[in-house]
Amino acid sequence: MALLKVYKNGKLLLDECENANHFFTRFMGLMYRRSMEEKHCLLLTPCNEIHTFGMKFDIDTIALSKDNEILFIDRAVPPKKVRKKVKDAYKVLELCSGTADKLGL
């Protein structure tokens, strides 16, 4: 999986973002992982809806447009949940729970 960096206004926010842009990498996502480091994230593309089945920890999710505009932030999503589709979303960032607030998003 390719690693990306996430910037906002030229400032580095997240230094290791996995790019899940194929069926299998999107399907697996964060399932069955024990944890996620705070400065890491997973970018699901294309994606407009997520679930947290098979996950062992809460996450923050950020729905993005094709132009990387933030459309919706869902904080502290617990395991075993399905979240609604976000209109016009093309990508979803999955982060450690609490990271969106720490980044000022």
Identify the role of each PLM range.
Residues 1-105:
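Compact, glycine-rich, soluble single-domain proteins
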